[in-house]
Amino acid sequence: MTPTIFLVILCLGVASAVIVPEAQLDAELQEQKDKEVLIKAVWSKFMKTNKLHSSENDQETEGSNIEMSASGQLTDEELMKIMTTVLHPMFEEEENKPQPVVDDPEFEDYTESGDGFFVPNQPQ
């Protein structure tokens, strides 16, 4: 077998093994992207309505004020990073605070003075 024939067979084998994109996976990916766009649109509409409602209530003397945090859009990693930066300094402050010194009574050895309590027939 000559090297050219071997090379042709190898090229044909590689060409036949090329991955063909599946239409079903592409459709699922497009559907997922459409859902994300819809979720973002609904979220932005909700936030606009929320801000409008809050601004209307700010003008009145009585009423409820609805506030929504943006943590609903954060991933788990982003939320953990924020919580770590907020809570970690709080716990460090508690650890670094000096503990109050409590006046402990001095240890008294009753065995030497004979003032101890006698317990007869104590099981061992």
UniProtKB/Swiss-Prot annotation:
Main location: secreted
Entry's localization field: Secreted, Extracellular space
Region annotation (Disordered) ranges: 51-74, 91-124
Residue stretches of biased makeup (Acidic residues): 103-112
Superkingdom, natural source: Eukaryota
Keywords: Secreted, Signal
One of the GO biological process terms: JNK cascade
Signal peptide: 1-18
Biased composition (Polar residues): 62-74
GO CC terms: extracellular region
Function: It may be a growth factor/hormone, perhaps involved in interaction between the maternal and fetal systems in maintenance of pregnancy.
Protein name: Trophoblast-specific protein alpha
Organism: Mus musculus
Gene name per UniProt: Tpbpa
